[in-house]
Amino acid sequence: MTSVTGPLLDAHYQRSFGVLAGYLPEDRSGLAAWHAVIREKAAQLRNDQGPGYANQAVQDLANLIDTNGIVRMYVAEAIDQTSAFMKNIKNIQDMLEQLDFICTTAPEYNVNKKLRVLFPMSALFVDMMATPAGKALFRLEPFNEALRAILQTWAAYLDSQASCWVLNRDLNIGWLGTAAIAEFKLADFVIDWDAEYGGFQSYNDFFHREIQASCRPLAGEGDANIITSPNDGTVYRIATDVQQSAVFWIKEQSYSLQDMLANPDAALLQRFVEAR
């Protein structure tokens, strides 16, 4: 099977949402370093676990790959087609073991942006998704349903108190450390600095933290002509003259109002066409 060239994989990686938003390191060597650590921890989890996987959803994906020849073919080919660059996934078992470990951990802050991985599953699949086999694989409903169950498993962990271990005051890797406080302007949020874990009950509780009423007032509140994102995040792109419909598919260049607004009535849609 022909491998995707290194330059093409790198170009896809640099255009990925994770890199542009700062959730994945721009330097791919940082991604490789993360994989090396995850692989070691995943091997330890597998050794402790014994036969099978720690998470049933990962075991179900393993069973799907074993019993569905089409899924197995595309998974194997997608991994093989990344071999022109740093092969961060060695084989199917390695992919499953890394997934199994990811489901039992929360994203750690890292003051060094070259080593920061805040989207672990995106980090795992970013190269596979750039390959011809990967593009076919991630369109297969059985594979996507299996991944959905894995994401739900991981979400349950992130909603649990077990995920609070990353909410610490470490200067370099703590979400409540001085570096993170400055970078993410945590003083603007409702945080109980006297309580353990800042008073948060889980990583997701911290991730969805409340902004203090006196900070960042909402512009255009009550004005139906304005759409304001309620999320606190990184601006991905500012676009003008957006059309009613466009080929956009993968967060690249064009945006489609019809799709972003979930097929609204024509009158509402036209209010935003080519708006600035």
Task: Write out the residue ranges for each language-model feature.
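Generic N-terminal leader/targeting and pre-domain segments
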Residues: 1-73
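Extended, domain-scale alpha-helical bundle/helix-rich regions
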Residues: 76-249
